[in-house]
Design a protein with these regions (language model features):
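Extracytoplasmic
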Residues: 50-52, 69-71, 79, 100, ...
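Structured C-terminal helix/loop/strand segments within mature extracytoplasmic catalytic/sensor domains
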Residues: 2-19, 34-42, 151, 199-228, ...
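Active-site-proximal beta-strand/loop segments in catalytic clefts of secreted hydrolases
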Residues: 58-60, 107, 137-140, 175, ...
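Conserved catalytic neighborhood of penicillin-recognizing serine enzymes
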Residues: 109-147, 155
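Active-site SXXK
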Residues: 63, 75-105, 136, 269
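Mid-domain, small-residue-enriched loop/turn segments at the edges of structured enzyme/sensor domains
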Residues: 49-52, 146-205
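Flexible glycine/proline-enriched surface loops and loop-helix/loop-strand junctions
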Residues: 67-70, 128-132, 139-144, 176-184, ...
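Beta-lactamase-like hydrolase cores
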Residues: 29-75, 294-297
Length: 299
């Protein structure tokens, strides 16, 4: 249901951080489970779409939580790109000048990386690190993501970064686009809905980053362009959304982020999905439908 309430501003979202995070707690210790009805509706949604659906969502003020397959492993896909940009901000941009560094790359590198809607147009000039962060989060540009991974020391730098923020599960092992193969038996390049949801919360609402870096990362997420048919489709139009999507083989289709209702506290939201067939298409209505259920339950 859409309302006519005033949409919260980006400035509001960028200043709510630490205060809102006081209710994040340590994962499950302070969580208040939501009603069984929403779990049943998520199960019905999963069956309707013949998929595996994983959900973690939490109202950071009340602690009320929805968890469905929240501790099962799912392919991470491009939701790692938020962690890559965050790691660059925290570990490489200490003097505030690293984001201005220009990185050069070849057309062959773009071709090898796969989907690259931004970097493909800047082969001749290269791009700054800041521009690469913007491209990989807002447009899910694979070349930009790989170049950031290269600066960080490779995919396993994301695993180390996740551990340093208190995430014991999330791991990255391969580069784009190989990391999206998403075989059901694979434990590499995976996360869980709870783990990645809480990591995003620590980055956007908590103190995992310095205030300047948190504001910059949040701004990129607020201006994401890839979730129009996923979270954005399922949430009321007047809710602010800072998120990152991802997708791969076996119908893997993810959306993770923070959303702000007009008159309420932030809600952490993580929806990860897979399907049984390798060539299954992404099921955006499944992700959007889950987001709608979570919004109705936790607002």
């Amino acid at each position: 249901m859409h309302t006519n309430k005033a949409r919260p501003s980006r400035r509001t979202a960028l200043t709510l951080g630490t205060a809102a995070a006081l209710s994040l707690g340590g994962g499950t210790a302070h969580a208040l489970p939501a009603t069984g009805g929403v779990t049943a509706r998520l199960r019905d949604l999963e069956r309707e779409h013949t998929a595996r659906l994983g959900v973690y969502a939490r109202n950071v003020r009340t602690g009320r939580t929805v968890a469905y397959r929240a501790d099962e492993l799912f392919p991470m896909a491009s939701v790692f790109k938020t962690l890559a940009a965050a790691a660059v901000l925290r570990d490489l941009d200490r003097d505030g000048e690293f984001l201005a560094r220009r990185i050069h790359y070849t057309q062959a590198y773009v071709t090898k990386s796969g989907y690259s809607p931004v970097t493909k147009d800047h082969v001749a000039t290269g791009m700054t690190v800041g521009e690469l962060c913007d491209a990989t989060i807002r447009f899910s540009d694979n070349t930009a993501g790989n170049l950031l991974l290269k600066e960080l020391g490779g995919p396993t730098a994301i695993t180390r970064f996740a551990r340093s923020t208190g995430d014991p599960v999330t791991r990255l092992d391969r580069w784009e686009p190989e990391l999206n193969s998403a075989e059901p038996w694979r434990v590499t390049d995976t996360t869980t809905p709870r783990a990645i949801g809480l990591t995003y919360a620590r980055l956007v609402l908590g103190d995992a980053l310095e205030p300047r870096d948190r504001a910059r990362l949040t701004d990129w997420l607020l201006r994401n362009t890839t979730s129009l048919e996923r979270f954005r489709k399922g949430l009321p139009a007047d809710w602010l959304l800072a998120d990152k999507t991802g997708g791969g083989q076996y119908g893997s289709n993810n959306d993770v982020g923070i959303t702000w209702p007009p008159d309420g506290p932030p809600i952490v939201m993580s929806v990860l999905t897979t399907q049984p067939e390798e060539d299954a298409p992404a099921d955006n209505p499944l992700v959007a439908g889950a987001a709608a259920l979570l919004a109705a339950e936790l607002a």
